[in-house]
Design a protein with these regions (language model features):
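A conserved beta-strand element that flanks and buttresses the S-adenosyl-L-methionine
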Residues: 164
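Class I (Rossmann-like) S-adenosyl-L-methionine-dependent methyltransferase catalytic domain
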Residues: 2-70, 76-158, 174-283
Length: 283
């Protein structure tokens, strides 16, 4: 994301409370200002699911019902379609109605290209051992409410077997991060559910305004150890990582991807992003 794009986003959101953010995202979509869109699915997520299937709920020809996945802040839905290719029934959620409209059009374009034999869409084909792509649904609404669940014909008690967060947490103001952690804990299936986070922008100092707001390994550890609690900082400004409490999440794996989006690379082409895999304590 260029400095110009970061400056426009930060000037739009940085000094505004979370409650005022709602109308601003649809306005940016209506302007067709979407610097967070990567033009395709996460290479890091694709490679992880192929290489480490033991770390996520499996999907095979005998899996019934299919596990459910959620992508909050899904934008045009590239990662939603990717997870469907791995066999998950996926809900793509975004606050902006225009995002849902573009996601629907993107899905239509991908399916048409597949029928025409376009090899560039092979990433969205069912993976080996997966009988067919999972069902895809698009929802519009506030991640922190239950209205989008009802819109997707799901009960408010619904939990998900896999949740993928990329450029969602970093879009929220720092004050909303404990609320994000609590909501993720509530939405994750306690029986084997996995939260997969692609850390971006990794290492950006928290003193620099966002969005995107900076993230570190310790930020996730502190937030998810005690969902809903505000992390504390040490005298040197580093984040204190507390012990995990009941209802918290533990990190199962921290992966340095071999590939990621260009936005997650250093100037020399090395990968800056990290990929985290989490489960609820006891899961």
């Amino acid at each position: 994301m260029s400095d110009h794009n970061s400056n426009k986003l930060s000037s739009t959101f940085a000094m505004s409370p979370l409650a005022s953010h709602g109308p601003k995202w649809p306005a940016l979509w209506e302007e067709k200002y979407t610097p967070w869109d990567r033009g395709g699915p996460s290479l890091a997520l694709n490679d992880f699911l192929l290489s480490r299937p033991n770390l996520v709920p499996p999907v095979t020809s005998s899996t019934a019902p299919r596990p459910k996945a959620l992508v909050p802040g899904c934008g045009k839905g590239h990662d939603v379609l990717l997870l469907a290719a791995f066999g998950y029934d996926v809900v793509g959620l975004d606050f902006a109605p225009a995002a849902a409209s573009e996601a629907i059009e993107n899905e239509k374009s991908v399916r048409e290209a597949q029928r025409d034999g376009d090899k560039t869409t092979d990433v969205y084909k069912p993976k080996e051992g997966v009988p067919s792509v999972g069902a895809v649904s698009w929802a519009t609404g506030d991640f922190f409410s239950n209205e989008w669940l009802e819109q997707s014909n799901l009960s408010k008690e619904t939990t998900f077997d896999l949740i993928f967060d990329y450029t969602f947490l970093c879009a929220l103001p720092l004050s909303a991060r404990p609320k994000w952690a609590a909501r993720m804990a509530a939405l994750l299936n306690p029986n084997g559910g996995r939260l997969v986070c692609l850390e971006f922008p990794s290492g950006k100092p928290l003193s620099q305004v966002g969005p995107p707001w900076g993230l570190t390994n310790d930020t996730y550890l502190a937030l998810l150890a005690r969902p809903g609690e505000e992390p504390t900082t040490a005298p040197d400004g580093s984040i204190n990582v507390p012990d995990i409490r009941p209802g918290g999440l533990r990190r199962l794996e921290l992966v340095k991807p071999a590939r990621t989006h260009k936005a997650g690379e250093n100037e020399d082409g090395t990968v800056r992003d990290w990929l985290h895999v989490w489960s609820l304590v006891g899961a």
